[in-house]
Regions:
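A charged N-terminal "starter" segment
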Residues: 1-100, 114, 122, 157
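Active-site loop/helix belt of alpha/beta enzymes
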Residues: 3-4, 38-55, 114-118, 131-232
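Short, contiguous clusters of charged residues that form electrostatic/catalytic patches at enzyme active sites
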Residues: 13, 17-20, 107-110, 145, ...
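Non-cysteine beta-strand/loop elements that form the S-adenosyl-L-methionine
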Residues: 62-63, 81-87, 104, 123-130, ...
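Short beta->alpha connector loops
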Residues: 65-66, 85-88, 106-109, 205-207
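Divalent metal-coordination and catalytic microenvironments
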Residues: 71, 127, 204
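A generic, well-ordered mixed alpha/beta core segment in the N-terminal half of proteins
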Residues: 97-133
Length: 232
């Protein structure tokens, strides 16, 4: 049988409607970050990011450096966050493309700092805290000291701090509440250490709809942009 291409037709008007619905549910003052990782979950990252920005998204987020560079190559100049880690050897590309990088290891932050100094630029980073997702991040008790070390480096702006919920999409919010507690304690410790971080974010798709108290400074809209519940 001959090979046949497969495609999906995306109603960008419906996508725009979804963004407006999401925006209407965000607490006043919170920024909207549209997550378009994995080619916007198969919907096309470039088209989805354009619609998101047209509908007032403040930030675009992806998972990898290659995804971020693809958007920059397409002409996007908006704030762009990589949610995953990169190797220190990729610092030049991150700084050169004005990408905001997630960090939790000092070797990466130091490489970004050195490259930013070399290029005469300031690189923005977001510190990720492991509160129960089991992925990447510093331990909550180490967050304040890590933030102090980052803030002391030249040409690095610690713009954000965040964490990921593990079970926010299920009815029982017991574990989610524990994650919120750990995140808040870590953020308070960072502030007490004299480091002010302007963008704190932990709310993702499920929390946008069900836990408005944790919208804080920014929310990350993922699968709900496309009309799906996170656990579907």
């Amino acid at each position: 049988m001959p090979n046949r291409a497969a495609w999906a037709e995306i109603d960008l008007g419906a996508l725009a409607h979804n963004y407006r619905e999401i925006r209407s549910r965000i607490q006043k003052g919170a920024k909207l970050c549209a997550v378009v990782k994995a080619d916007a979950y198969g919907h096309g990252a470039i088209a989805a990011a354009r619609v998101a920005l047209d509908e007032g998204a403040d930030y675009i987020a992806v998972a990898t450096l290659s995804e971020a560079l693809k958007l920059r190559a397409a002409g996007f100049t908006c704030p762009l966050l990589i949610l995953g880690l990169v190797e220190p050897e990729s610092a030049r590309e991150v700084v050169d493309a004005d990408i905001t990088q997630t960090v939790c290891r000092m070797d990466l932050v130091e490489a970004l700092s050195q490259e930013a100094v070399r290029q005469g630029k300031t690189v923005k980073v977001h510190l990720t805290i492991e509160t129960g997702m089991g992925r990447i991040g510093v331990h909550p008790k180490d967050a304040a000291e890590t933030a102090k070390q980052i803030a002391a480096l030249p040409n690095v702006e610690l713009e954000g701090v965040f964490s990921h919920f593990a079970l926010a999409d299920i009815p029982d919010k017991t574990f989610t509440k524990q994650q919120v507690k750990l995140f808040k304690e870590a953020c308070d410790a960072i502030e007490a250490a004299g480091v002010h971080i302007p963008i704190k974010h932990i709310a993702e798709s499920a929390a946008i709809l069900e836990i408005p108290d944790v919208h804080i400074d920014m929310v990350r809209a993922g699968i709900i942009q496309y009309g799906l519940w996170p656990s579907d």
